[in-house]
Amino acid sequence: MAAPQNYLAVIKVIGVGGGGVNAINRMIEVGLKGVEFIAINTDAQALLMSDADVKLDVGRELTRGLGAGANPAVGRKAAEDHREEIEEVLKGADMVFVTAGEGGGTGTGGAPVVANIARSLGALTIGVVTRPFTFEGRRRANQAEDGIAELREEVDTLIVIPNDRLLSISDRQVSVLDAFKSADQVLLSGVQGITDLITTPGLINLDFADVKSVMSEAGSALMGIGSARGDDRAVAAAEMAISSPLLEASIDGARGVLLSISGGSDLGLFEINEAAQLVSEAAHPEANIIFGAVIDDALGDEVRVTVIAAGFDGGQPPSKRDNVLGSSSAKREEPTPARPSESRPSFGSLGSVKPKEEPEPAPVPEPVADLPVSPPPVPPSRTYSDSAAEELDVPDFLK
């Protein structure tokens, strides 16, 4: 007889390196339920401080438990050397979160290795990492960028939290300790926003397959968090989440959105609907929006909204460039309003002439049509090619 099957999704959260281990300590502290915590580090001393269910010292041979010295190559080698052990602790997971603070050694180098192992075992793999504060130095920032690019190749979805953005929502008197704590808190929110959807039975319940449909091979993702009290609290919290300072870009155009709304037992279905509607309007018209509502009496009259938007890789950067081009072309075409119908053809013809003359003949087209009187002075100097001369010389007259 086969053993009875466990039909609950197995979720494992792996903290890699100092930042990742600190983050899972914070998650354990606040009582994140329904997940197994694994701490992986090359620093034996930091591992001693961890409350994780499983601790893996991957630096005992390579670094003698003394850490990677902020060298990603050492972190990568340490994780590769202990690949079988990491594989063993990840076996059986349906979903794996890889969390790390990018820019150091173990997290930056080891996280892509851990993610690669998790994905090869068939788990839905989500990276939740922080980009370092500016005050941590340029070298760390450069290492972080390389690490993020590497990790993006190995995960289904990657959420990057820029620590600098935390400064914009912090008090000027905030201590360094509190700044890093708030970074851990955001990592917690990213993981909790997803795991609660799966593990906590809610008003509007979601299962693992719902989450997988949005996050499988989704590429880069954005995460926003908002909370509010009082009138229209759900809508206010949703607005705060989609315009969150933590978002490096807009969620416009996202094809997959996870929306988690938590509130006390007085949380109304109508409130949830309004908040979900607001988020759906901000996303792509064809977006797959998965939303769930969780009742948590500990929140009192507060409503908390977590939005995770994914599935717009390649869409976002071009849209920004388009805007830039749009603004410059708008400037060029300022003189055109008089005769909009002629603006396009003349712009094209000038484009071909441009290399011969000045680099800025763009304003010429419309005025040429507008001022048929301008050609007369031209013939004396150039009688042999009327049309070309007109086109090229008109800008000087206009100026």
Curated annotation (Swiss-Prot):
One of its GO terms (biological process) is division septum assembly. GTP binds at residues 18-22, 105-107, 136, 140, 184. Residues 311-399 are annotated as: Disordered. Residues 388-399 have a biased composition (Acidic residues). GO terms for molecular function: GTP binding; GTPase activity. PROSITE patterns: FTSZ_1, FTSZ_2. The keyword Cell cycle applies. It is found in: Cytoplasm. It holds the Pfam family FtsZ_C. It comes from the Bacteria. The keyword Cell cycle applies. CDD domains: FtsZ_type1 (cd02201). GO terms for cellular component: cell division site; cytoplasm; division septum. SUPFAM superfamilies: Tubulin C-terminal domain-like, Tubulin nucleotide-binding domain-like. Essential cell division protein that forms a contractile ring structure (Z ring) at the future cell division site. The regulation of the ring assembly controls the timing and the location of cell division. One of the functions of the FtsZ ring is to recruit other cell division proteins to the septum to produce a new cell wall between the dividing cells. Binds GTP and shows GTPase activity. PANTHER family: CELL DIVISION PROTEIN FTSZ-RELATED, MITOCHONDRIAL DIVISION PROTEIN FSZA. Homodimer. Polymerizes to form a dynamic ring structure in a strictly GTP-dependent manner. Interacts directly with several other division proteins. Belongs to the FtsZ family. This is Cell division protein FtsZ. It comes from Streptomyces coelicolor (strain ATCC BAA-471 / A3(2) / M145). The gene is ftsZ.
